[in-house]
């Protein structure tokens, strides 16, 4: 199968903050902490093949970031402790940058590798996500397990409560075609 790609198929999208979110879940010996942030910004740039798949060349680009102090669990005390752990005054944003993208096992699924920058440190993670698009927008959804120790962060221990260093992160990006 041969698919032709031309520059006309390259599309830039801007992340729509109101429709996009990052949800997180961390476990402790007492309970599960869940939270969400919606104030995401960023851009996605892809070249579409004629069959609606993302072309490997030129490589897709994606940059997304979010403000640490918009990460909310519904518990103000926990939120402030989380921001303090991340050192939100020195490192007010978390960023994600796509490095590689390859077609996955099923239509609309892709394997990705990218860098997450948290608390001033960048680490490479691999994952898989789904992509849906139409003429006006693109929607990307995926899940990733992040270990906060990779970023030099120590899981908090509050007397008898221990927090697991693994955090499950679910991402939903909705981005509108840029003019």
Q: Where would I find each of the regions flagged by the language model?
A:
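Low-complexity, acidic/polar, glycine-enriched regions of mature
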Residues: 1-179
């Amino acid at each position: 199968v041969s698919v032709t790609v031309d520059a006309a198929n390259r599309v830039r999208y801007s992340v729509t903050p109101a429709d996009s979110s990052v949800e997180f879940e961390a476990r402790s010996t007492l309970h599960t902490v869940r939270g969400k942030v919606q104030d995401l910004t960023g851009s996605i740039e892809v070249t579409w093949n004629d069959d609606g798949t993302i072309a490997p060349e030129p490589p897709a680009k994606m940059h997304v970031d979010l403000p640490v102090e918009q990460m909310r669990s519904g518990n103000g005390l926990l939120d402030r402790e989380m921001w303090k752990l991340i050192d939100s005054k020195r490192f007010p944003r978390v960023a994600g940058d796509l490095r590689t993208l390859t077609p996955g096992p099923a239509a609309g699924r892709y394997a990705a590798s990218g860098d997450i920058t948290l608390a001033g440190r960048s680490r490479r993670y691999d994952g898989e996500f789904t992509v849906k698009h139409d003429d006006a927008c693109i929607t990307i959804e995926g899940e990733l397990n992040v270990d906060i120790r990779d970023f030099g962060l120590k899981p908090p221990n509050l007397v008898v409560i221990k927090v697991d260093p693994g955090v499950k992160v679910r991402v939903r990006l909705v981005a509108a075609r840029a003019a």
